[in-house]
Amino acid sequence: LRTLWIPDGSQARLIDEEIEYPVGTVISKTFYYPTNAEGHVLKQIDLAERQIDLSRNKIIETRLMVRRDARWDAFPYVWNKEETEAFLRIAGSSVPINLKSDTGDHDFVYFVPNENQCSGCHVTSHPAGDMHPLGAIATQLTAAFDYPKNNTELQIDKLVTRGWLTKKTNGSSPVSWRDEAANLEARALSYLNIQCGHCHNPEGPADTSSLILDGSHKFLINLGVCKTPVAAGGGSGDMLYSIVPGAPDRSILLYRMRSSELDEMMPELGRSLIHSEGISLISRWIGQLPGSCS
């Protein structure tokens, strides 16, 4: 659940298709799991449910990004068991959770990032870059949302009609990775962009890997096709290439997505479980790639 608040009398500006938020802006992201009638925490969420009733969900944490005069600051809050109050946890925290699904129970530890770990993703230009939002940007606020009074509007257009943004964007909208009707490659690259591009970009902390997944490079070698690892260590799974066309099970990229080991898994922050839907998508994309690495 994401929210955006802009101080009264202030506006965000669209400059070169990028949103510049005013001082005092607060962006929140609340993490939760759905619950059943018995109060058990469930693994699957109903993505078709656009209006969220938090009373039917187990709330875990809320992360805030606050715009200051010269920078963004991040604040992780953890909710109490009664879900009546959230407490600031600058040093991070851990929450044991039991999830129920059709395949049985899943026990795991939910890790809340500390303040410094927030910058691990939200500083996309290293080493001297500043923290900034990843989701509340012009190219990502393009989903249609059902607002009150039967009003369906793109999120970024709603910011304009509300008076929170100076003008609409002229840029193109990315394909949603969930859109089954869209091109498979476009969906896969969109998924890799939002999951990996904050690090795997020409100026990011993973730039030395030469694996560029933020959409800025279209050469197959930059996407990992037949590219040997630079510093994967044990994360390579004794495989030779990041992506082997037609062979997802021999591709390091998918191996690391499937792993939950701390020194292997990708993304390395922000998850404790394996994202089966994303793995299925990337596996299908790699499986239909033509060519070979021999």
Task: List the model feature ranges, each with a label.
Residues E18-A37, I45:
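Extended, Lys/Arg-enriched charged tracts that mediate electrostatic binding to polyanionic substrates
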Residues L1-V23:
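A domain-level signal for the mature, folded cores of soluble proteins
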Residues I6-G9, T30-Y32, L269:
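Acidic/polar N-terminal loop/beta-strand segments that form early-domain functional surfaces
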Residues R13-L14, N36-H40:
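Short, solvent-exposed loop/turn elements at domain surfaces
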